[in-house]
Amino acid sequence: MAKSGLRQDPQSTAAATVLKRAVELDSESRYPQALVCYQEGIDLLLQVLKGTKDNTKRCNLREKISKYMDRAENIKKYLDQEKEDGKYHKQIKIEENATGFSYESLFREYLNETVTEVWIEDPYIRHTHQLYNFLRFCEMLIKRPCKVKTIHLLTSLDEGIEQVQQSRGLQEIEESLRSHGVLLEVQYSSSIHDREIRFNNGWMIKIGRGLDYFKKPQSRFSLGYCDFDLRPCHETTVDIFHKKHTKNI
């Protein structure tokens, strides 16, 4: 296992801090997070190398960069194999009142240009604020580099007069998506309980509260009303898996 042993001079302090964290995560077998830190630390070391004139220091830096790159590559191969075997699992715990968990912040890592189809299973896309949550999720998909063409939604049907509002809201979202070249297919189930989101690049995300994990804003003019990275969250758990194939709803 790689060790951070980087000399603490002003130029390399940032790199040393990130790489120290990478080694800690590595030792705890938190490989996805460790890989991110290794990659960031390597980029910082490369910047230090560009500004270093002393040949001895340059040689030492190249050696350290090579060592960290080897470790990062080994972790990447391990994670890729986990994905191939369908064993990959990452868990994120969102604490009560935590911020920084907008849909873009949570999902962007898993949305690349290969994503063309999305499946959402969530029994609670019914009330007005839940319809807005689904709309924000769709907006996020449209803005990402992926080329989503079809969105499948499986949810439960509201009761009474609220059913009209739910159907009308989803119809308006469907029409709006169609104007952007995206097909929305909605199905209803009275027995749905699970909440999960799947992309056709193999990623599957299960959120304990589904899309409805944001708290109500304190007022219409409080921070977080518009920017959901600033919106406090309810406590929930996010489980992320990777499978070679996703199933249809």
UniProtKB/Swiss-Prot annotation:
Comment, domains: The C-terminal domain interacts with lipid membranes containing acidic phosphoinositides and is required for location at the midbody.
Gene3D superfamilies for the chain: MITD, C-terminal phospholipase D-like domain, Phosphotransferase system, lactose/cellobiose-type IIA subunit
Top-level taxonomic group: Eukaryota
Region (Important for association with membranes): 168-231
Effect after changing R220E: Strongly reduces binding to membranes
Effect of F221A: Abolishes homodimerization
Result after altering Y225A: Abolishes homodimerization
SMART domains: MIT
Name of the featured protein: MIT domain-containing protein 1
Keyword entries, A-Z: Cell cycle, Cell division, Endosome, Membrane, Transport
One example of a Gene Ontology biological process annotation: negative regulation of protein binding
SUPFAM superfamilies the record matches: MIT domain
Chief location: membrane
Boundaries of every MIT domain copy: 8-86
Nucleotidyltransferase recorded as keyword: no
Subunit structure comment from the entry: Homodimer. Interacts (via MIT domain) with CHMP1A, CHMP1B, CHMP2A and IST1.
Compartment annotation: Late endosome membrane; Midbody; Membrane
Function field: Required for efficient abscission at the end of cytokinesis, together with components of the ESCRT-III complex.
Pfam families found in the cross-reference section: MIT, MIT_C
Keyword Transport carried by entry: yes
Topological relation to the membrane, as annotated: Peripheral membrane protein
Gene Ontology CC: extracellular exosome; intracellular membrane-bounded organelle; late endosome membrane; membrane; midbody
Organism taxonomic ancestry: Eukaryota, Metazoa, Chordata, Craniata, Vertebrata
